[in-house]
Amino acid sequence: MGRENELIQAVKSGDVGAVQKFLAKFRTPKSKLLGSTKRLNVNHQDADGFSALHHAALSGNSELLLLLLEMQASVDIKDGNGMRPLHYAAWQGQPEPVRLLLRASASVNAASHDGQIPLHLAAQYGHYEVSETLLQHQSNPCHVNKGKKTPLDLACEFGRVKVVQLLLNSHLCVSLLEGTSKDPTDPNFTTPLHLAAKNGHLEVIRLLLKLGIEINKVTKMGTALHEAALCGKTEVVKLLIENGVDVNIRNTYNQTALDIVNQFTTTHASIDIKQLLREASGILKVRALKDFWNAHDPTALNIRAGDLITVLEQHPDGRWKGHIHDPQKGTDRVGFFPPSIVEVISKRLGSTLSRNITVPSHQHLAKTVLTLPIQHSPGSQLGINPDTSVAGDRHSVGSESSVRSAGSGQSCEGQQINTALLIENAQTMDFGSENLQNCQTFPGPVSGHHLSTILPVEKNPGDYLQGKDAEQIFCWLRGFQMETYVGNFISAGYDLPTIMRVTPEDLTAIGVTKPGHRKMISTEIGKLIVADGLPQQIPVDLWDWLSQLGLPEYHKQLSENGYESLSTVTELTWEGLQEIGIHRLGHQKKLLLGVKRLLDLQKGYPIGGTLRRRILGSQDTVAVVEPPENGDLPVTPKLLTFQGAELSQELQSALTRGNEQLCTGRRSFSQESISSRSQGSGHSQESASSYPVLPVHLQGVDLNLPERNHPEGTDQILQNHWVPNGCLIQPEPPAPPPKPALKKRSLSACRYALSDGEPEEEEEKKIATAGTGTLSTYATLTRRPGRSCLTNGKPEKKVQRSQSFAVRARRKGPPPPPPKRLSSMSSAEGQSPEGQSSVKTIAAQLKDIGRGTGFSASTSKATDTEVLEGSGTRRRTVSESAAGLGGRLSLPLTTKKDEEEERKEEPISSQHSSSESIPFAEEGNLTIKQRPKPPGAKLEQDATSELSPTQESQLQSAEAQRHLESSAVLAKPVTVVLAQARPQIAAKPQIGPKPDTGARAPPATSIPKNEEHDFNLTESDTVKRRPKVKEKEEESPKAPLANNSPSLIPSQEPLTQDTLIAKIADIDKRLLSLGEVEDSVKKTGIDTRSTGVSISQTHLVISGPQQVLQKPSRAVTGPLFPAGSILWDEESEASSREQTCIPQQSISNSDKGPPVFTSSLQNTEELQDTRGKSCRETVQLTKNILDDISTMFDDLAEQLEAMLD
């Protein structure tokens, strides 16, 4: 049969001429005896069942089809799949071959093995003309293939819009839409709408919905909404919801469309779909009260009385768009109708869609608008300062993530228990005159003239049907002409209590994109007074908690996602809310605030707890006064810092002290310094006296104010009636004369500190004194070590100190890189800034010394404040370590009288550390948090760099005298009180002054038993550093230091006289060795014109196995040291005095007290000549070093200033 195969190949290749030759040979039969059986078989089929006519139909060649049909080729021959030539012609899509086959009487409804007729193929591939031809030849559009699909199903599945239109225009349209030829119980049952929704064909869906297909038809997978949601077709979901699909229908797996999205989809589109589905759950259901139709409006909905209407949206022109489903006929109608003809019959949990919706006028006429009463009490003032800073910050609850949705509008989910009517703009709202009278709006921007108190919002299911939240927010915004943003707040899920938590980022997210409007709204938000709407007691369960928050619609959502109890709901985060589908910013904030309140209630905090509202101005001042002298502290709850750490006892008592006296608002030097710095740095700020604080008179207002959006650490307490036991600030008297202008270098460094202090804080606190009975200390509160609580919690009694907190905003922008560390000095508590100083302070101290400024030595006694005065120009000493480590060194205390006398004589520039061990520093200093370089002399560079020639000459002469006195250090009187072991006292050491010139110490001194104190100095209690250059030099043996090997070891056992003598000899030898080695690197800072003998106290610092002696930058003169004090003397720094005698130590023992040391005098004039020359050389070397370091500091200051600019 080779000829038949040749024919098939010729047809397959489309060779019409070869086919004609083949057919011509066998067209006329020859009358031969044996030739009649050799006729050509035109219906021959190959291995796949294809005949020549199959190939001709598939190729679409009409000539070949005609030739084969003339040869009587079988038109309905089937291949291996049961496909006929008409199937292939319909699949190929050319109408002429289809017509030829149909004229040849091809079967139009013959099905293949898979049940498909030619119309299935034509419809699936969108061949409109072929489909039309088949339909004209009575093809059955309701024919179902083995996949239970009709040609319409295939056309809808593949989005063949024209074919769908063609099929739906046929006489079998109703049957196609109803699926009468299908078995609904079949697992493969589906509808055209399901297939179109699954594949996202919007136009096909619109055609089907237009022609009335049942939108809620359920298959095994659910409704068409289930299919679209599962496949991530956001626009289809939206279209179906708009056309009234029931989002609560469950499939055979008991899943709603939202359940499917939550469980099976992770795409970005699923987020929008979740939102749409949640919105749809809050669609309003109404019942028609009377018939309605409008023949002149094609978009009007024909309504009969009693029809159930699903409200889809509320149009800006006042009409509502609704959907009516007729279960009997299986049809759905969508159109517009007036809201006056319906009544509400159901309120689903959730809210309306975030569309442009207005409150209909009839509801305002029928319902009473919630009023905002304005209380006009005689003499009442607004309870908030006019200068209150209301700008929100990043740390408010929920705002750390508000930037995520900027510009998105925060599409919404449930608004409390039911539907809130959204308002597009206030112009479309048709309030009646009587309603405007009831709704008392603010007479203008709330600027402090009246107390505008908004009553707490009671939430019940009927409130939001009247648009109560919308009306409240509208009345509030209308007071300052911002009513156009009502819809923004409502659609984002805000009510008035939650609006008070709004930050500028949140305003941007909800659509307030104009900076001026954001600023105005933020200002007015700060002046709102409204209950926080948070639980006042621990809820019973999750439902109770959500009900108190007014968000019970989320109970099911939270429960289904694993938050079934209060213990688990406290772990909610913003990410968790996003994951479970709560996207409305207002609801996120309220839930997270509710979690915070729940935690506070569980921890036993008072109502308000850590969510207390914080309102402060740009530089308000709150006075903090120490407890009374008797030490009695009021019984109040413990106060916490913004890190959650407990405040020191002094601050606890000060912040909770009653109104025993009015705190004077005297302008402090620190505030002047802040003002001067801000003028130079571009941060112009008003002083604390810019606005007087008005008295507050609140009537019936809940004082549990919510948290304000201000930087953490600025939790200031509202005064007078706002917070009990507050303190009112009075208008300030005229400011004292301004301080001298600051140098630019120090100013730049200070700006760096203000912007690089606390990474997560917007502002830094300035601490300064405001009292009149004691001298003030001006310091900068910087980062606490490790963000922990204060180290020394017990204040010193009978030392009244008033401190005030002022606020200065730091500059925005990325922080500059940290300065280079210059040393490895550290302590167990972390680096404390007491021992650091700026260039300005070093120079100022040396200038004062050069002019001869000193202390009057008649009655003053050196306290811990003097120890820290010059700490900026030297390393940390024992006294500083005791302050920074919270009193680890147990050292003697002075009496109250001595401290008060010395405090009264301190100059204004005296600076010290507070007794609370707060890491204070000097005013204007502590600008660069760095440690000194290992060389001991490299922190005095700025002092020498700014000295005048006269001061330099004084410096050289002082160096000469220093060498003379350092050699005779053993001859100086040293009084060391050593006692048996007893509990350590958390206090600072008392430094005793040196006796006057010519005075001789008594042969023996007796110390009473009650004056005894411990001296416990171990390496673990002191500051640890790497060995300095000086210390390395000490390791090389020298002739005078041959026996200088023992070290000071703390003794915990009773000491005998012999032991004491041996230990004192060791101390003396160590002092001498260190004095000789350090004389080349010590700075001079002594009064050159004083007539008394001035000494510089040196404090013992442990560094490894060695002991280093440090001296302060200021000399102190005074009488004999009092009993109970500790004094280590290194070398005197007198520059031009005549020293005729040097004390020499001797030892005596007292019967009633521990051994003490007295001294005799020794003439040392011959040592002056031998030391003078080497001293001058050392001074010159030191000056060169200081000049180099000064240049380095200048470069660093310029670099920091450039970074800040």
Swiss-Prot record:
Extent of the ANK repeats: 48-77, 81-110, 114-143, 147-176, 188-217, 220-249
Matches recorded under SUPFAM superfamilies: Ankyrin repeat, SAM/Pointed domain, SH3-domain
One protein family per Pfam: Caskin-tail
Positions of the SH3 domain: 281-347
Ranges of compositional bias, category Polar residues: 377-388, 398-411, 823-840, 942-959, 1042-1054, 1137-1155
Biased composition (Basic and acidic residues): 1009-1037
Name the UniProt record assigns to this protein: Caskin-2
Gene name tied to this protein: caskin2
